[in-house]
A protein has these predicted regions:
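A short, N-terminal "cap"/entry segment at the start of jelly-roll beta-barrel domains
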Residues: 2, 14-67
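His/acidic/aromatic-lined binding-pocket segments of jelly-roll/cupin-type domains
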Residues: 63, 70-73, 108-109, 116-117
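A short hydrophobic beta-strand segment most commonly corresponding to one strand
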Residues: 132-143
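Bacterial N-terminal signal peptides that target proteins for export
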Residues: 1-7
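A generic "binding-loop/recognition-motif" signal
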Residues: 67-68, 123, 132
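Conserved metal-binding segment of the jelly-roll/cupin
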Residues: 110-129
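Short, conserved beta-strand element in jelly-roll/cupin
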Residues: 66-87, 93-104
Length: 143
């Protein structure tokens, strides 16, 4: 009976064991990318997501992503995040990504180390007033 249970368990686990696309990036490799990053460094990319480490010491410019949701975890520092409002004077590329210009209106919040942020596709956003070095991981999820 025990042998049958073990065999059944292995059969059920086979799809999990055979999964592809699993990625583990060792802490030492991430630390190397973090130390080398002037502004950002790509950790991993597929057609469904892009994972980056970003480093900011100056104000950003407004962004709005047509098809990407930003998921971020702040590692160090603090920054003022404005979301919503209206972007003007920006450029939009062929993929629907808006950069530059100015952001009017919106909601402002100060984010700190340890905070989790999720900015849905289509929402204008802007990071300003970084205090010292602002470090964060961002995964852009294609919707």
């Amino acid at each position: 009976m025990l042998n049958r249970l073990i065999a059944a368990g292995l059969l059920l686990a086979t799809p999990v064991l055979a999964q592809t696309g699993v990625l583990v990036v060792p802490a030492a490799e991430i630390a190397q990318k973090v130390n080398a990053a002037a502004t950002s460094s790509t950790i991993a990319t597929t057609d469904k997501y892009i994972s980056l480490f970003s480093h900011r010491t100056v104000d950003g410019t407004p962004e709005q992503h047509a098809n990407w949701t930003d998921v971020m975890v702040v590692q160090q520092g603090e920054v003022t995040l404005t979301t919503g409002g209206t972007i003007s004077g920006n450029t939009v590329d062929a993929k629907g990504e808006s950069h530059g210009g100015t952001l009017a209106g919106g909601t402002t919040v100060v984010v700190h180390a340890g905070d989790y942020l999720q900015i849905p596709a289509g929402v204008p956003h802007l990071m300003t007033k970084p205090k010292g070095d602002f470090h964060y991981f961002v995964t852009k999820v294609h919707i």
